[in-house]
């Protein structure tokens, strides 16, 4: 009996101990936590009751970087325009980390951002999602980016077709885009990913140039003001720069699709504020870029500023209407830009597949620009600046003095046996060539017909010339200006190919 009493007493002691422990370890802290939470809520309510309503209707976190083309985002006029629309924009410089930038749009960390079109495509492929859409075009590179090299080692783009040639550049930058455009469009079968030597920043590319020799087979792919510095060396030349082609190095404003659905008005207000600032600075971009560079701690001299501003085409309101298809004009449509850039990225191995699955239209949203145009939004009188595809005509002597740029990569043109008639399959190839030539409007084209060494050489040369002229006629009939094309027969090498060499008239 006594032992049972001891057991029962022990059990009750355990139960009391458990209750005491629970009271001390759970109930008391929970009560204290509840009291603290109530006090915190009361404090927060007091803050709300003793504050004022914000002047801003919406806040937008906008991811971008220090590129001079983005100087308008950092301007006082843009801030004032946003304030008038009750928008607060927090600019976040992520050091051009495009993957994290797109992930930020995906997660809601950012609502809007600046991208180059190629970076948007590559980042979308990398994360396997399309969380952002293009709503406006910021600018297009027009000479700001260039590929330079020593004249002795690399006289033209054809000389790049050498496994010993190395490209010194920054990955995921306009410099890489420029290099991939050249890889895709010219006959550079010996150039591969191994040809690229990525470095951390522009200063490192320039340092590599300073340490190189004229015999080094290096290509330095950079932007202003470094290009100007390198070209001060008479032994260095500009192999190609972004003023020679169109629609590949293009900066755009993108919006998170979720945010766009949630608050399209805020995106519209942002775009109107930005385009108004583009108009405001239309005649003073040099001053803005100079002050922006000085503020960033990287002051530029007058010549560097002039070349930098000349190399960037900031798109105004009417040009955005044209690019986005809101108005019908001769400017390249953004859908074609996206398709062309995607093709370059796939053909050069930068991405394995098209993240838009052959539907470039899902990467842009033109409704906002359409709406503001229909509401007669024009910040001022602006001109739609166009580029003529018609080059000055040349005489025979001038044609003979063209400086070669490089030979375009074109699949073999096939003719009906013994004739100059282009086959239907090769007509498809020539149609693609027409589109390619439209993106290189600043160069003349020499169509070179080669001939077999068998049989009657003179007859073979005559056929080679007729085949070159047949191709020339096809291009002219499909919109290529007659002033920029010349068909010739070259001294026979045994091949029966037709080659396409771009060139320019030296000044």
Q: Which residue stretches match the model-derived regions?
A:
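Short, glycine-/small- and polar/acidic-enriched structural segments
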Residues: 28-202, 218-224, 247
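Ligand-binding clefts/hinges and TM-proximal coupling segments of bilobed small-molecule sensing domains
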Residues: 36-39, 167-194, 273-311, 358
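Pocket-lining segment of extracytoplasmic ligand-binding domains
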Residues: 117-119, 193-301
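Secondary-structure end/capping motifs
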Residues: 263-353
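Periplasmic peptidoglycan-binding/tethering modules of Gram-negative envelope proteins
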Residues: 369-444, 501-507
């Amino acid at each position: 009996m006594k032992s049972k009493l001891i057991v029962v007493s022990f059990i009750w002691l355990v139960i009391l101990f458990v209750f005491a422990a629970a009271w001390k370890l759970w109930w008391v802290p929970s009560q204290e936590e509840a009291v603290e939470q109530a006090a915190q809520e009361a404090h927060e309510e007091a803050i709300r009751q003793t504050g004022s309503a914000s002047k801003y209707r919406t806040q937008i976190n906008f991811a971008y970087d220090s590129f001079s083309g983005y100087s308008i985002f950092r301007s006082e006029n843009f801030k004032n325009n946003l304030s008038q629309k009750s928008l607060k924009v927090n600019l976040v410089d992520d050091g051009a980390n495009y993957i994290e930038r797109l992930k930020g749009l995906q997660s809601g960390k950012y609502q809007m951002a600046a991208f180059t079109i190629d970076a948007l495509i590559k980042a979308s492929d990398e994360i396997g999602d399309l969380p952002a859409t293009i709503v406006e075009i910021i600018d297009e590179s027009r000479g700001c980016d260039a590929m330079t090299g020593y004249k002795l080692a690399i006289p033209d783009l054809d000389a790049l077709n050498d496994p010993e040639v190395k490209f010194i550049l920054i990955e995921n930058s306009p410099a890489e885009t420029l290099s991939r455009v050249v890889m895709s469009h010219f006959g550079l079968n010996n150039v591969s990913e191994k040809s690229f030597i990525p470095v951390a920043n522009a200063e490192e590319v320039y340092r590599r140039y300073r340490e190189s020799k004229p015999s080094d087979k290096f290509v330095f792919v950079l932007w202003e003001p470094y290009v100007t510095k390198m070209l001060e060396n008479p032994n260095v030349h500009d192999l190609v720069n972004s003023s020679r082609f169109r629609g590949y190095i293009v900066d755009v404003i993108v919006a998170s699709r979720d945010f766009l659905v949630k608050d399209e008005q805020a995106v519209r207000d942002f775009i109107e504020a930005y385009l108004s600032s583009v108009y405001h600075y239309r005649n003073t971009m040099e001053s803005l870029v100079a002050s922006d560079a000085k503020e960033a701690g990287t002051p530029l001299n007058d010549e560097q500023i002039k070349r930098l501003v000349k190399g960037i085409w900031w798109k105004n309101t009417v040009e955005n209407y044209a690019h986005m298809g809101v108005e019908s004009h001769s400017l390249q449509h953004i859908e074609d830009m996206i398709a062309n850039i995607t093709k370059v990225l796939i053909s050069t191995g930068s991405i394995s597949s098209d993240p838009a699955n052959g539907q470039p239209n899902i990467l842009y949203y033109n409704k906002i620009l359409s709406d503001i145009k229909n509401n007669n939004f024009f910040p001022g009188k602006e001109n739609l600046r166009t580029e003529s595809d018609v080059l000055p005509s040349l005489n025979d002597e001038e044609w003979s003095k063209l400086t070669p740029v490089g030979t375009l990569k074109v699949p073999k043109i096939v003719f009906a046996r013994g004739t100059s008639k282009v086959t239907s399959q090769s007509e498809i190839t020539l149609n693609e060539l027409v589109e390619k030539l439209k993106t290189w409007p600043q160069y003349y084209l020499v169509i070179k017909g080669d001939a077999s060494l068998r049989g009657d050489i003179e007859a073979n040369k005559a056929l080679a010339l007729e085949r070159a002229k047949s191709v020339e006629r096809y291009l002219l009939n499909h919109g290529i200006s007659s002033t920029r094309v010349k068909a010739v027969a070259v001294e026979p090498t045994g091949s029966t190919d037709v080659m396409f060499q771009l060139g320019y008239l030296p000044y």
